[in-house]
Amino acid sequence: MINLERTAVGKAIFAFLLALAVSSYYFPFGFSFLPEALNTKQILGVLGIIVFMMNCIRDRAMYWHKYVGVSCFLACVFSVWCFICCVYNGTEDYAYAKYFLSFFVWMGGAYGLVSLIRANHGKPVDLPMITKYLTGACVLQCAFVMLVAYVPWFQNMVDTYIVQDTTARELDRMYGIGCSLDSGGVRFCTVLILIAHQLATNKEVTSSKKATYLYIGAFLIISIIGNMVARTTTVGMLLGLGYMAITIGLAHRAVLTRRQVIFWSVFLVLLAVMIGLGVYFYNNDASMRSNFRFAFEAFFNYVEKGEFSTDSSDVLLERMWIWPWTGDGWIFGYGLFEWGNWYQYGIQTDIGYCRFTLYCGLVGLALFGLYFIYNATVVARKFRDARLLALILVVLTFAIWIKVSTDIFQLYALLFCIIGDYELEELEAEAALEE
């Protein structure tokens, strides 16, 4: 009997299934034949809780890192403050008063996912490994996006059996499976930054032409198709390019090393190939032309009109900067977050800073910001050469709030559950001593 797991085809199948599992965590969705409230993130969360309890029973102890406890405490403090704001304002919009539940669901999902990956590989999951899977999941989502857009039977299957936000379909925007609009764009952003980190700091990647080509190719694919899904992806693309420019060269060195010349040559060649393909499809496919013009609207407006702007940026500047209009509103907000609750007041804003302030005041906004700053400091301490990575993740958090009220804790949950560089070194040292 052929051992499927040991064959090349078998390995490819297992890798695809794991990438699908990662995608189901990072881009959660439901099924039409399951209860409406149940999605893939929650399924993985239940799996994670079961595995965690089994590990606790096996080890006869309940253990989690101190930083998870601190992060949980900050999430609970923020939730309590949001609840106080709702009580103070006499509302029942508990969107973020229940944030602590979201914390536990993401942590459970991350723990379950990391347990699956570890079981498949038989070793601890580290940052390079989880970056590979997240990259694969995002490229897979890009493939889903194109299939939904250009293969009718696939779109019909997704629309029939997959339960997800339908806003993208209603707005005639591109979407994948659990991936659409700004929430999908923000997740693309985080992975673009992780790819840049691997290209800049991982010697196994930089010493391998194949790995370098694959990561650069993935970076470009996610940047292009991700922008077709949501132009928020541009933020991650620019931060990733900035990260690579600072760490790999160009930004502070007058003379380039051989490694830098090779890296940027490969990058420019692959970029030229992508541009060539883009120009071909732009000129020969009306639908692709429309998608390219949406994805890079600012560029086209600059070339054609001399204005570096988009329709959404104009709307943000003109109508969406809305702040509290009473003194106590600046402290406690108005206890309203969901769009439907604001319609009666004629208020519509996507801007994260405004929505959080209107919901729970500047105090709540500050608590939420502190929560993500702390999560980033954990990343800086847990992984080698990760200070710049942590800083860029903080910049991403506060940058996306200019456009939308979402967050990136799903990434931090994964990074909390994988092994840190220094922990891995200790395990390797212990294993060497035992041998």
Please give the residue ranges for each predicted region.
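N-terminal hydrophobic segments of proteins, predominantly signal-anchor/transmembrane helices
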Residues: 13-30, 46-108, 395-399
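A juxtamembrane structural motif centered on a specific transmembrane helix
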Residues: 1-13, 205, 256-264, 268-272, ...
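Interfacial loop-to-transmembrane-helix boundary motif in multi-pass membrane proteins
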Residues: 67-75, 113-153
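Long extracytoplasmic/lumenal interhelical loops at the membrane interface
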Residues: 158, 162, 299-360
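A conserved mid-to-late transmembrane alpha helix and its immediate loop/hinge
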Residues: 175, 180, 336, 345-379
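Alpha-helical transmembrane segments of multi-pass inner-membrane proteins
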Residues: 131-156, 179-229, 234-247
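Transmembrane alpha-helices of multi-pass inner-membrane enzymes
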Residues: 193-197, 241-242, 388-398, 405-435
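Hydrophobic transmembrane alpha-helices and their immediate junctions
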Residues: 242, 250, 359-400
